[in-house]
A protein has these predicted regions:
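Binuclear metal-dependent phosphoesterase catalytic core
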Residues: 33, 39-61, 75-158
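His/acidic metal-ligating clusters that form di-metal
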Residues: 1-72
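Composition-driven, intrinsically disordered low-complexity tracts enriched in small residues
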Residues: 151-175
Length: 175
């Protein structure tokens, strides 16, 4: 994210409910979303991890409607800084840290020709789209989209044939 994401936050005491400690130059302060700057329904699950100094916002500002980031895996909010929409989206993957599985999300951004510079946006969470994550290996494999480890993923999506089972017992891996 850009340092300007901190402009959407309000400094608070460390004991404030849902307060998150900042990073780097902001590490001595705790923050919550500023309800006057961030859209309703947003949340912070960790501090904003960004460079201390960056000219990127100034370079991008005039040519963009908004900036969408996903580096901070536990944050999901939208706000506006100097006419530019700043969007934070939590991780949608399962191979990294992040929010609880049913809160992992992707973000839908809708542009309407009647007001093209004011897109609508919403989080589409795993819990809302799919339901509770399963612990079945085949399902987890499909979500992670990673090659399975040894012994994981062998004939998980279809029942193995008799030949495949015999081959696995007497001379192979069962694949």
């Amino acid at each position: 994210p850009l340092p300007q994401y901190y402009d959407l936050l309000k400094p608070v005491a460390p004991t404030t409910a849902y307060a998150m400690q900042g990073y780097r130059a902001h590490a001595d302060q705790y923050y919550v979303l500023d309800e006057n700057k961030a859209q309703v329904g947003g949340y912070m699950g960790e501090g904003i991890s960004c460079p201390d100094v960056s000219d990127e916002f100034a370079m991008l500002h005039d040519g963009l409607v908004g900036v969408s980031t996903g580096h901070d895996h536990r944050n999901g909010f939208v706000g506006n800084v100097d006419g530019t929409m700043l969007i934070a989206t939590p991780t949608c993957g399962f191979d990294t840290y992040g929010p609880a599985p049913d809160h992992r999300a992707t973000r839908l951004i809708e542009f309407d020709i009647r007001h093209p510079y004011e897109p609508r946006t919403q989080l589409l969470t795993f819990g809302e789209l799919i339901g509770k994550p399963s612990s079945k290996k085949a399902y987890t494999y499909a979500i992670n989209a990673k090659p399975p480890q040894d012994g994981e993923g062998d004939d998980l999506l279809r029942r193995p044939s008799l030949w495949s089972r015999l081959f696995g017992l007497f001379g192979g891996h069962g694949r």
